[in-house]
Amino acid sequence: MNKLFRPLIQVAQKVWFRQRRKGLRRRIQQQYGNSPDADIREVVAFLNRHAELELPMGMIPPCDWTRDYAPERISVERDAGNGLLYVKVKEHQVFFPRRFSPAEVQRAVSIGQMEQDERSPHCYVGNGFNVDEGDVAVFIGASDGLFCLSLVERLAKAHLFEPNSDWHEPLHATFAPWGNRVEVVPLAVDSQDAEGRVKLDTFFKERPQPNYIQVDVDGGERDVLAGAHGILQDAGKLRLSICTYHQRLDFPKFEGLLGGLGYRIHHSPGFFLIGVRMPYLRRGILYASRGTPQSPAWTWRANE
């Protein structure tokens, strides 16, 4: 793109966004006010209770319970040995990059715990959808490792993919107690193999196949799945938790792709209210399962 036009395009995008925000609450209420979906009705009721909120809400779920996750309740300490800041989670130390301030650690942990609340649209597992004892699990976009930590005791092996070098030292420190059961992989997962990037099909060609894959890569989820076609097609037993809120049409696209491969499809509870274009409400996490017992708690969106 010509450098001369880039600032003009950015200004035009900001103007367009501001214009689209006008009347957004009204359009949402018109679009969803009579929905039979209980999750949608809860969002509309929340908006009716909170006329003071500016829309869209971004990554904060439109739910009253989010107020329970105040950053200041998080206690942050510094390890005398490695000098890293950490928090205690279920008696385990979770370490953070050296550049983080105590306030940044508090905010990161508060958001991470809020996201994995069983009521959250960002919850990766719950209500009958979870890993099994002895599973091989993959965490793509591992970040602080909080989610992996919640499952690690049940896993035979965990592979944490995180290309951001800021996280490599703290991840190694956090998971040191589990030795070689946890592997920190300093690569991005992609649709093609390249320097600093790898396909899942390539990575697992000579390794035990995964039983669980979690994907949260800021909109690159399509590329991750494209590079895992062999795993997805051939898996006997596999569960996936895939973020679908980064791109507004990812949920129906992934539902069609994985449903066509024989996976049962469901989703996390609730919605995010992120964008100013239809659909205004986005499901947070798509759950996909093949070769596993069907949870009696859900009516799966199945292509069976």
Regions found by a protein language model. Name each.
Residues 1-304:
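Phosphate/nucleotide-binding beta-alpha loop and adjacent structural elements of enzyme active sites
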